[in-house]
Each structure stands twice: as structure tokens, then as C-alpha cells.
From Swiss-Prot:
Gene3D superfamilies: 3.40.50.20, ATP-grasp fold, A domain (3.30.1490.20), ATP-grasp fold, B domain (3.30.470.20), Phosphoribosylglycinamide synthetase, C-terminal domain (3.90.600.10). ATP binds at residues 135-196. It is an enzyme of class 6 (ligase). HAMAP family: GARS. PANTHER family: PHOSPHORIBOSYLAMINE--GLYCINE LIGASE, PHOSPHORIBOSYLAMINE--GLYCINE LIGASE, CHLOROPLASTIC. One of its GO terms (molecular function) is metal ion binding. One of its GO terms (biological process) is 'de novo' IMP biosynthetic process. PROSITE patterns: ATP_GRASP, GARS. Pathway: Purine metabolism; IMP biosynthesis via de novo pathway; N(1)-(5-phospho-D-ribosyl)glycinamide from 5-phospho-alpha-D-ribose 1-diphosphate: step 2/2. It comes from Salmonella typhimurium (strain LT2 / SGSC1412 / ATCC 700720). Keywords: ATP-binding, Ligase, Magnesium, Manganese, Metal-binding, Nucleotide-binding, Purine biosynthesis. This is Phosphoribosylamine--glycine ligase. The lineage of its organism: Bacteria, Pseudomonadati, Pseudomonadota, Gammaproteobacteria, Enterobacterales.
Length: 429
């Protein structure tokens, strides 16, 4: 069968790499893909942008694609799934209506409130004065979020009132996040430890994926501004069996049932970003309507199940007949980014020292890369690569991941040197 993966990031390289391992699959196309997918013998890039739905659809029809897997959020919120389904094509992802769970933070917070799903206390604002009054009433620390899609960067955790007021002005008057900031959500600052809880949903049944923990801040020790994610590991020890059960009962099931009841039946990957308090109670920080990036990379390295088989079952509403199998070992991925990220950075720099052959139990996934005409690999984004490895402990996986990237460099490249620190601290105690 033929599979199409939509996207060009590290997540899509990992999903396509995993899909190509399925015995059901003959060819995997990636639209538009990156240098990493271009260099994989089993994958084929197609030069179509992720939001060019007519071109994606006509390619899928022309090539008789049997299954499409959507990586990023942008095509989901503009209805790629609706278009493919209307044409009778199998596609794994939520409809435009269901993708509002990620596309609008205000929609999500109101949905959570309607269904009594645990989350931070909040209010939505479109005007500066009431927003500032609310800030002064609540005090800092406090969280300000742009309503729409801002590539994971539209969230300001303000530790002082001045910082909070500046963020409100910036988002509502200064238009720091384009259309995404015309409405903001202000919510209470939650204390605890974060985890990424990702499941597959077929509208009615749910199949949990491996848990993971992302590192959002750009700097070591979780300092500096938020990014799309600087590294991740799986499983996340903070998600104990008890926390897992609470998350399914209090968050995942009520969300799936609530969406169906409101006429937005949810199919696709559903990613709950959780904050887990000292008592092991999870609250929703955010929902994403797709697999996380960089969480996908370590999770796919651990996945023993056939990803394509699971996606097909989900498209047919038969996820209850499937289980997922995972490597017992831990997996850890470190993002190598371009100097200046998450601010402005240069592109087109040549990347040196990429591993020339496959490594056992490790893989360097490509994100912001492109292949030059002379086959040199160049940078094309802020997050460029993700060096990922398995290990019997998180500490061992960390050591192996960093070893994979020893020789990789380009002008200004950088990474955090402490990915996995929370889990390693637990292992040592």
C-alpha cells in the first residue's frame, strides 16, 4: 500500500520512518519533507506545501494513496481531513471542527469548563483594560496565551505584574502574534511537573501512546523563552500508573465523549499537555491535535507496534481491537537548533558531521533541513535536527543521544546539555 505523510519537521521524519517499517507498506511519500526524508531510501519527498490542500488532494488521488497521516497542526485547522474524507480517501487526523481543540485556546478552555475537565482557572479577553484589571486582581506569577496558533511560542509565563502587563499590550495592541493575538486567555500559574500524554482516538475508542516529557525553555535548567521544544524523553516517570489512570478517567475520556456529544467527533492523535501536582493530580495546560515535536522522535524509537496498522484501525473505528507495544528501554532526543532560535536565526548554513550510516538503537532525525542541488545538507529552520537514542535508563539514553551529535555542527548551532534532567535526578535518588 501507499502512505502519504504531510509535514516537513522532525516529527514527520520520525512518523514516515516508522511507517516505512510496516510490512503493509510499499511506498511512503512525504509532502514536502526535508533533507532527512530525502536521504531515506524508503521515503520519497513530494514538493507540496502542508497547507496546499487542493494539491495534496490531487496528488493523493492521482497516486491512489491508501492512508494519509497528518503531522502538523496548520493543515488540520484549515480542514485537510474534511477535504480528503469528502473525496473518499483514508486520512488519520481530526476534522476542522475537532481541531479547534488546538486552533483556539479560548474554545478549549470553554470546552474544558463545560465538561468539568481539570484545568487552570482562566478568563478570555479581547480588550486591554479589562485584561489589565483582571491581572491586577490576580497578581503574578500568571500565564498569558495568544488565542490562535503561534507555533508553540504564543505563551508568556509572567513572573511579575510588569511582565504580564507588557505581554497583554504586546498581544492585544502590538500584534506580536499576528491574528493569533486578537483574543487572549489569561490563566492561573500552575505548579508541578509537565508531561506529554498522547493517545490515538478513532472517534469512540482510545489507544494510549508512550508517555513523554518535553523541555520547552531554550536554556539549560529550563531558563529563557519558550520554544517549540528543545528535547524530550520517554517514558515520563512522573506519569505513574495512578496518574495514567487519573488522566484517562478525568481528562481523555471526558474529552473524547464531550467532543462527540457536541458534534465534533474526534479522530486522530490527541496530545494533552499536562501539569501534574505533588499529589499526582493532572490538569490540562493545552491540547494539541497531533503528535508532539520533539516527543514523536523518542516515542517512535520505542514503538514496536505497526504504526500504519494502528492508523488504519483508527480510520475504521476499530482501535479497541488493537494494543500498542513498546521497547522497555528509555528513549531521549536532543534538538540541535540554529543560533538565535527562538528569535531570528539564519538559514542556508551547511551542516557538517552527520552520521553516514545507520546506528543501532539511535537515529538523527531531521527537522529544519533541506538538500542542496549538490546534495549538501543545509539548515532551513530554527530547530534543525533531533539526535535520539535508546538506553536502559534515561541517563544512558541521554549519554548515547549526546554521543550521536558529537561531530554535528554548523555556524551558531546549539543545544541544551541537560535534556532529561528531571528523570535522571529521580534515577539517582
Amino acid at each position: 500500500m501507499k502512505v502519504l505523510v504531510i509535514g516537513n519537521g522532525g516529527r514527520e521524519h520520525a512518523l514516515a520512518w516508522k511507517a516505512a517499517q510496516s510490512p503493509l507498506v510499499d511506498t511512503v511519500f512525504v509532502a514536502p519533507g526535508n533533507a532527512g526524508t530525502a536521504l531515506e531510501p524508503a521515503l520519497q519527498n513530494v514538493a507540496i506545501g502542508v497547507t496546499d490542500i487542493p494539491a495534496l488532494l490531487s496528488f493523493a488521488q492521482h497516486e491512489k494513496i491508501d492512508l494519509t497521516i497528518v503531522g502538523p497542526e496548520a493543515p488540520l485547522v484549515i480542514g485537510v481531513v474534511d477535504a480528503f474524507r469528502a473525496a473518499g480517501l483514508k486520512i488519520f487526523g481530526p476534522t476542522e471542527g475537532a481541531a479547534q481543540l488546538e486552533g483556539s485556546k479560548a474554545f478549549t478552555k470553554d470546552f474544558l469548563a463545560r465538561h468539568q475537565i481539570p484545568t487552570a482557572e482562566y478568563q478570555n479577553f479581547t480588550e486591554i483594560e479589562p485584561a489589565l484589571a483582571y491581572l491586577r486582581e490576580k497578581g503574578a506569577p500568571i500565564v498569558i496565551k495568544a488565542d490562535g496558533l503561534a507555533a508553540g511560542k504564543g505563551v508568556i509565563v509572567a513572573m511579575t505584574l510588569e511582565e504580564a502587563e507588557a505581554a497583554v499590550h504586546d498581544m492585544l495592541a502590538g500584534n506580536a502574534f499576528g491574528d493569533a493575538g486578537h483574543r487572549i486567555v489569561i490563566e492561573e500559574f500552575l505548579d508541578g511537573e509537565e508531561a506529554s500524554f498522547i493517545v490515538m482516538v478513532d472517534g469512540e475508542h482510545v489507544l494510549p501512546m508512550a508517555t513523554s516529557q518535553d523541555h520547552k525553555r531554550v536554556g539549560n535548567g529550563d531558563t529563557g523563552p519558550n520554544t517549540g521544544g528543545m528535547g524530550a524523553y520517554s517514558p515520563a516517570p512522573v506519569v505513574t500508573d495512578e496518574v495514567h489512570q487519573r488522566t484517562m478517567e478525568r481528562i481523555i475520556w471526558p474529552t473524547v465523549k464531550g467532543m462527540a456529544a457536541e458534534g465534533n467527533t474526534y479522530t486522530g492523535f490527541l496530545y494533552a499537555g499536562l501539569m501534574i501536582d505533588k499529589q499526582g493530580n493532572p490538569k490540562v495546560i493545552e491540547f494539541n491535535c497531533r503528535f508532539g515535536d520533539p516527543e514523536t522522535q523518542p516515542i517512535m524509537l520505542r514503538m514496536k507496534s505497526d504504526l500504519v496498522d494502528l492508523c488504519l484501525a483508527a480510520c475504521d473505528g476499530k482501535l479497541d481491537e488493537k494494543t500498542s507495544e513498546w521497547d522497555e528501554r528509555a528513549s531521549l532526543g536532543v534538538v540541535i537548533a540554529a543560533g538565535g532560535y527562538p528569535g531570528s536565526y539564519s538559514t542556508g548554513d551547511e551542516i557538517h558531521g552527520l552520521p553516514l550510516e545507520e546506528v543501532a538503537d539511535g537515529k538523527v532525525f531531521h527537522a529544519g533541513t533541506k538538500l542542496a542541488d549538490d546534495d549538501r545538507v543545509l539548515t532551513s529552520g530554527g530547530r534543525v535536527l533531533c539526535a535520539t537514542a535508546l538506553g536502559h535508563t534515561v541517563a544512558e539514553a541521554q549519554k548515547r543521544a549526546y554521543a550521536l551529535m558529537t561531530d554535528i555542527r554548523w555556524d551558531g548551532s546549539f543545544s541544551r546539555n541537560d535534556i532529561g534532567w528531571r528523570a535522571i535526578e529521580r534515577e539517582q535518588n
